[in-house]
Swiss-Prot record:
Residues 1-17 form the signal peptide. The keyword Signal applies. Pfam families: SLT (PF01464). Belongs to the IagB/IpgF/P19 family. SUPFAM superfamilies: Lysozyme-like (SSF53955). This is Protein IpgF. CDD domains: LT_IagB-like.
Length: 152
């Protein structure tokens, strides 16, 4: 059932960024401002971003999903190209990954750091450095969002 809901949510037409961020955040109980902070850091909100890492792996789309997830994506009926052509899919998949890291580490900043640095015990310093950057971005984006809501 969970897989069906994930697939259904990802194929809802991309009606606008706000709708996509909010739906992914609601689905996985993650603030949409946090997802936006990650997208800003990872791709600068560039849905066409493709980056090659030092180890030769590639990251795709607005949320820079690593090709480590290729097999899992294919099992779900997706491809790396779809992460680029359907930015909402990228956002939902990133929220799903972040939720999985939160199950491992708890709903804290180390889970956010694992999104980028992975789960190796040797990478704890990198996780915390990444999380600090995301935290600053998150605070700014959340404050901007709150201010925009007041104007309505």
């Amino acid at each position: 059932m969970s897989r069906f809901v994930f697939i259904l949510l990802c194929f809802i037409p991309y009606l606008g960024r706000a709708d996509c961020w909010d739906k992914a955040g609601e689905r996985y109980n993650i603030p949409s401002s946090l997802l936006k902070a990650i997208a800003e850091k990872e791709s600068g909100f560039n849905k066409f971003a493709v980056n090659v890492n030092n180890n030769g792996s590639k990251d795709y789309g607005i949320m820079q999903i690593n090709d480590f997830h290729s097999k899992r994506l294919r099992e779900m009926g997706y491809s790396e190209e779809m992460l680029i052509s359907h930015p909402c899919l990228s956002v939902h998949y990133a929220a799903k990954l972040l939720n999985e890291f939160m199950m491992m580490y708890g709903r804290g900043w180390e889970a956010v750091g694992a999104y980028n640095a992975g789960t190796s015990p040797k990478k704890k310093k990198e996780r915390l450095k990444y999380a600090e950057d995301i935290y600053r971005r998150y605070l700014r984006i959340a404050a901007e969002s709150k201010q925009n809501n007041r104007r309505i």
